[in-house]
Amino acid sequence: MTDERSGRDIYGEAYEEANEPIFSGIPTFLKLPQVDRDQLADEDVDIGILGAPLDTATTIRPGTRYGPRAVRAASTVPSPPYQHFNIETGVDPFDTYSVADTGDAAVSPGDTRQSQLNIEDAVYEVSEQATPIVIGGDHSISYPDIKGWAEANGYEDIGLIHFDCHADTGDEGLTGFEYDHGAWVKRVYDDDLMAGENYTLIGPRGFWPGPDTYEEMREAGMKWYTAMEVAGMALDDIVADAVERATDGTDAVWVSFDVDVMEPAYAPGTGEPEPGGLVPREAIYMVREVVKALDPDDFGFDVVEVSPAYDASDTNSYNGGITSGFANRLIIEVMGSMALAEQGLEEGSPIKPKEPLGPSESTATPADDD
């Protein structure tokens, strides 16, 4: 990975041939090349996209098994592949990284635990050769995601930054099943992969888990910022604290984003919506700044709980919906921030107006009438 490359250098003829209509061709993520997981090194892939279509560990509304498909569909809409220059950050991740879609992990609707082990194996394969970005699936996939990623890289102590409406630290989840989507953080903690002091939760609200679980979290040194606290605080302060905690004495950092952290008006397509969540500008800004502050070579990311059956403007996932489109945007933002971190930059080369922001000198204002 060097900052001398361009998208054309990385993708060659595929870059030039990518501008086919969005409704044609193989619907990989962003219409990127599909590369078998055992071929990532041969193809010089830097970031591997992996689907984890598991939802049998959910507890309320199922449907996230279709999340990877919907996010891939949404990813074909905004702009041509390999061309994602961000006017705000001034970076196009495809000028820095070679990215490929590695398909989906094998899942069996009749065997939740075996499906999770299959996901762990698939993430391990990706992580041996590339940075994993995983699309869920319910939130139970994050435990095998982290297990496979850590084992492939020899990480013994990881930091975790967790965006979610729920803490997911239940000893036996929500149902008495220790591997359901409400227990994965506790599984990571119990495996001694993460110290409580290296964990930060952003956005919890509502009525689960109960006070006993939060007391245990506090005793373990875990920290959280509720959705209302996020709304009333400086986002940069939250980001700085979460990053400092996640990187203090750790080998690497995983960021996990559950779309139910969002206000349901902006992310209706999920299994357990809860009023009072984050708005997109808050979430995008914090994810952008968190990832930019981390080492892209010791990093992993997943976005989970996209359930397209409940989404707005999604009919059979032909082009995705509001929620799947938001998940797609997060992934592109993550890759853009990784590219900035790889280059050691706070920002790329955003294109600014000739005049500074604010009223032009010739513009009349109400004060001029006094």
List PLM regions with ranges:
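Conserved alpha-helical scaffold segments that buttress catalytic/binding sites
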Residues: 2-370
